[in-house]
From Swiss-Prot:
Known pathway: Metabolic intermediate biosynthesis; chorismate biosynthesis; chorismate from D-erythrose 4-phosphate and phosphoenolpyruvate: step 4/7
UniProt gene name: aroE
GO MF annotation list: NADP binding; shikimate 3-dehydrogenase (NADP+) activity
Annotated catalysed reactions: shikimate + NADP(+) = 3-dehydroshikimate + NADPH + H(+)
Known EC number: 1.1.1.25
Annotated residues for binding of NADP(+): 77, 126-130, 150-155, 213, 237
Keyword Amino-acid biosynthesis set for record: yes
GO cellular component labels: cytosol
Organism per entry: Psychromonas ingrahamii (strain DSM 17664 / CCUG 51855 / 37)
Active site: 65 (proton acceptor)
Protein's job: Involved in the biosynthesis of the chorismate, which leads to the biosynthesis of aromatic amino acids. Catalyzes the reversible NADPH linked reduction of 3-dehydroshikimate (DHSA) to yield shikimate (SA).
Name of the protein in its database record: Shikimate dehydrogenase (NADP(+))
Length: 272
């Protein structure tokens, strides 16, 4: 069997082994998938050992995505733009390729939920690594406008500079946001701390899709707040997690698993 893994610290909360085991069963691919937690200063050594011990590929989560970016011998275009790597693959030629499937996972989940991206007006809250990882794939869907709002305005401006050639992207202060949005994505970790980003309630209409990249067994604080403002269609990041994993699996094995089926099983697993 071929060996795959997820690297992170901490890693015990990771759902990746559960997800990829289901993918393997679904596609009848013979793989073993484990979770590895190196010390924060020992990541590259652990990665080297993994590939020396017949590892074929791995997922990377916090806090190692930037280090994985540096470790990769080749980068895909989307990984280069994202400035971070969440998927590594060892090719038959012995080359380690770095990719970033986060944005593809988000877009897949949005499409699976019948969210129209082409011609839409999108607000992306936050300008950290999570936001940078999804800007390219979102712009590839040709939205009318992608606006980034962040507490530190200069960080939002930096992202617009990186992605300006890919589509209509701009930065905006929270206080200057206006009009209504078709899709509002929260890429910050505010929900993990029980907080809600400071955006005006007038930006949300009943038809606005609300997407929090965070997830939990309960409704996230951001999604609960949006629901109070009248939003009827809210999604959390669990589907993105499964979607990016499906993309990684396809990169490694050449077969795309059914993310919807595994998402349903994972949600049931979280609820029990």
């Amino acid at each position: 069997m071929d060996n795959y893994a997820v690297f992170g610290n901490p890693i015990k909360q990771s759902k990746s082994p559960f997800i990829h085991t289901l993918f393997a069963q679904q596609t009848q691919e013979k793989i073993v998938y484990s979770a590895i937690e190196p010390a924060t200063d020992d990541f590259k050594t652990a990665l080297k050992d993994f590939f020396l011990e017949q590892g074929k590929g791995c997922n990377i989560t916090a806090p190692f995505k930037e280090q994985a970016y540096q470790y990769a011998q080749q980068l895909t275009e989307r990984a280069a733009l994202a400035g971070a790597v969440n998927t590594l693959k060892l090719t038959d030629d012995g080359i380690i390729i770095g990719d970033n499937t986060d944005g593809a996972g988000l877009v897949l989940d949005l499409k699976n939920n019948n969210v129209t991206l082409k011609g839409s007006r999108i607000l992306l809250i936050g300008a950290g690594g999570a936001a940078r990882g999804v800007c390219g794939p979102l712009l590839a869907e040709h939205p009318k406008e992608l606006i980034i709002a962040n507490r530190t305005f200069s960080k939002a401006q930096t992202l617009t500079t990186i992605f300006t050639k890919l589509g209509n992207i701009s930065a905006c202060e929270f206080s200057e946001l206006s009009g209504e949005f078709d899709l509002i994505i929260n890429s910050t970790s505010a929900s993990l701390h029980g907080e809600v980003p400071l955006i005006g309630t007038k930006l949300i209409r009943p038809e606005t899709t609300i997407y929090d990249m965070m997830y939990s067994a309960q409704v996230t604080p951001f999604n609960a707040w949006a629901k109070e403002q009248g939003a009827k269609f809210i999604l959390d990041g669990l589907g993105m997690l499964v979607g990016q994993a499906a993309e990684s699996f396809a990169i490694w094995r050449g077969v795309k698993p059914d993310a919807k089926q595994v998402l349903n099983e994972l949600r049931h697993h979280l609820a029990t």
